[in-house]
Amino acid sequence: MKRLLRFLKGYEKESFLAPLFKMLEATFELIVPLVVARIMDIGIKNQDNVYIWHQCVIMVLLGVIGLACSLIAQYFSAKAAMGFSTALRKELFFHISRLSYRELDMLGTPTLVTRITNDVNQAQTGVNMVLRLFLRSPFIVVGAVIMSFTIDVKIGLIFLIAVPVISIVIYGIMRTTVPIYKKAQSFLDRISLITRENHVGARVVRAFGRQQEEYKEFSEVNDDYTKVQVRAGKISALLNPATTVIMNFAIIGILWYGSKEVSVGILTQGEVVALVNYMNQILIALIALANLIVAVTKAMASGVRLNEVLDTQPSLTDQGNSVQKENAGAARVVFEDVSFTYAGSKEPALSHISFTAKPGETIGIIGGTGCGKSTLVNLIPRFYDVTSGNVVIDGNNVKEYPFSQLRKKVGMVPQQAVLFKGTIRDNMKWGKEDASEEEIQRALSIAQASGFVKSKPEGLNTMVSQGGANLSGGQRQRLTIARALVGDPEILIMDDSASALDFATDAALRHAIHEQTKGMTVFIVSQRATSIKQADKILVLDDGELAGVGTHKELMESCEVYREICLSQLSEQEVNR
């Protein structure tokens, strides 16, 4: 948690003033019992109403000034805590956006979401409470003990005994509950994961009638979380009665010994009442300190989790200072004995892949499920770094390109058609921020999306809901293809991005791409043989290895894997067409 305190930079003044005003409030609070003692010993004893009213006015003033100090302290602590969480959340968001797919796969989306929301909130609460209580509570305890000694040294010893005993009880309860709270946080992560998976896969869950099974899984984890929280709650519930019992014994001691000293004239009745008030103040301060410890413990646990994210360094480094020669026209892509293994996997996803895609060629990639097709094309824009070998674009290793230049060269259409909340125009401009109307319309036309966009009353200004939920699967895919085309990239990668299109639309799309993207090197990943049949070169993958390279005709003669795929999907006449 200490390492996160750097995010309080810029709020040094608030971080100083918040505890200062809390200590001022505590000072006024410590004076109040003495005023009460004077009212009893002088005003009431002498039946001096003027004196009583005078002291009451002083009490009111002390209360008002204390309240003002408290409100000012609350303002400064809240401002500092909110500034802290805002800076931390921004840094986390920026840091996560720099992580490669490897780190994102390792950390997991649900965990990252929990950390940037719940854990940041826990850290914010911890900072807020520390600024308000970390000096105030000890100040009250020490101040009350000192005040008790100024009234009577022997009764002050009762305070010296009671405070450590209450502190030990609080420490014991906190030491027991803190690990339980940490365990509860892990269950909360699991709940977040299940909830997210169920929400994202809601259609699949309902399609297979798995609602009861999903509910059962969620209920089990939720019940475990509840049990842990209840267990922590039961132990924490001992805090108030245990400390109250100790305090009551201390008060009994004060009253018993105080009454004896009152009877002999050493103490006054007002002073005994003041001592009881100081004991109550100590108890309240220690309980507040216990709550602070709980909040700080949760904040520290969250701090560890947040530091885990911040300490995760991106495995891909951006050669931001490199200056590469811009090549006009389509790009040449070369794979030189490329192998790749996912983090944590024992088996390579790709093994010894070598091929050359000449400028302007269309490369089809086909193979069985899980054979490494998507992995291969993800290496071109450098979403992952190769384990061995080289990926070369226009004579330069992809590692030598600045990310901005490399991503500008490559237009990526991912397997999952992801659209963002906003208008269709907004989504198109992801491909090119200053795209003109003509460029957008051309991209939509090639992607076979102009028809349905024009049919919308608002056209390009039609609102797209989060994830494109208000569009069909085929419409989403066509818009993501158009988005990639708007930027007029040198390399276009379509990763099984036409799977939701009917055969006629798919054929029209392939024809448009072939005719109107002469200046691009195109990679088409597909499960459909018809989608890659006309490609200049076809790569056939089998269990991460290159089973064949060539044209459709060449592979039908030389590659058994490709022949089996084609014959399983097409008739003999369609194969030879």
Set out the residue ranges of the language-model regions:
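Membrane-integrated ABC transporters
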Residues: M1-E29, V36, I44-I58, I65, ...
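Transmembrane helices of ABC transporter permease
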Residues: G10, E14-T27, L62, M129-A184, ...
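An intracellular "coupling" helix at the cytosolic face of ABC transporter transmembrane type-1 domains
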Residues: G10-K13, R98-R102, N118-V127, L131, ...
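Hydrophobic alpha-helical transmembrane bundles that constitute the permease/transmembrane domains
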Residues: P19, M23-I31, V64-L71, A123-G126, ...
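Short intracellular "coupling" helices and adjacent cytoplasmic loop segments at the cytosolic face
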Residues: N46-Q47, M82, K90-T114, N118-V120, ...
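Helix-loop-helix
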Residues: Q47-Y51, M147-I161, I170, R231-R305, ...
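ABC-type nucleotide-binding domain
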Residues: E326-R577
